[in-house]
Regions:
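N-terminal secretory signal peptides that target proteins for export/translocation
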Residues: 1-5
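Alpha-helical and His/Cys-centered functional microenvironments
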Residues: 7, 16, 131
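Intrinsically disordered, low-complexity repeat segments enriched in small/polar residues
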Residues: 7-8, 29
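Sequence-pattern detector for short linear motifs
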Residues: 8-9, 148
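Bacterial N-terminal signal peptides
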Residues: 10-20
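Aromatic- and Gly/Pro-enriched helix-to-coil junctions and flexible linker segments
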Residues: 22-154
Length: 154
């Protein structure tokens, strides 16, 4: 009986932590970045630099597009048209809108950055597709970071 109460208490604490984490992300997303000018996500940068990251095959991993078009995860991507190797303009705009759910402008704790990053490099351990990036020095991870921080094409 005592073990059951303890297990219930742990479940309650875990649920509270989970809900608090979700609420803090929503709060962070609703607040502007703490830089001199609030970061804004740039569509042109997204299309040119971020979408290719979702299409890249990395050793030992599926491409992001493989799982994130059919799953019900917070990051959902539009499926590629049959026979296409990339998205068309309309699909890219839809992806841009969808990605904003996990890319809070100016927030380095954004799930887009933390989720696919190896835990040893500062990522979180809960990504079903494995740790796509082993280091914060990975050029593709740096493209995601630049996007979240508001980079634009020059």
């Amino acid at each position: 009986m005592h073990q059951m109460k303890r297990a219930s208490a742990y479940m309650l604490v875990g649920a509270c932590v989970f809900l608090a984490a979700g609420g803090s992300l929503k709060q962070a997303q609703s607040q502007p970045a703490a830089s001199s000018g609030a970061a804004k996500l740039d569509y042109a940068f997204f299309k040119a630099k971020v979408e290719p990251v979702f299409l890249t095959k990395r050793p030992g991993h599926a491409r992001c597009v493989v799982c994130h078009t059919i799953n019900n995860a917070p990051l959902h991507l539009v499926p590629l048209s049959p026979g296409s190797a990339s998205w068309n303009e309309e699909q890219s705009r839809q992806n841009f809108e969808l990605v904003q759910r996990v890319a809070a402008p100016g927030l380095l704790e954004s799930p887009l950055l933390k989720h696919p990053l190896a835990q040893e490099a500062g990522g979180d351990p809960h990504h079903g597709g494995g740790q796509q990036f082993s280091s914060q020095a990975d050029p593709e991870w740096l493209a995601l970071k630049a996007f979240v921080l508001g980079a634009t094409l020059k």
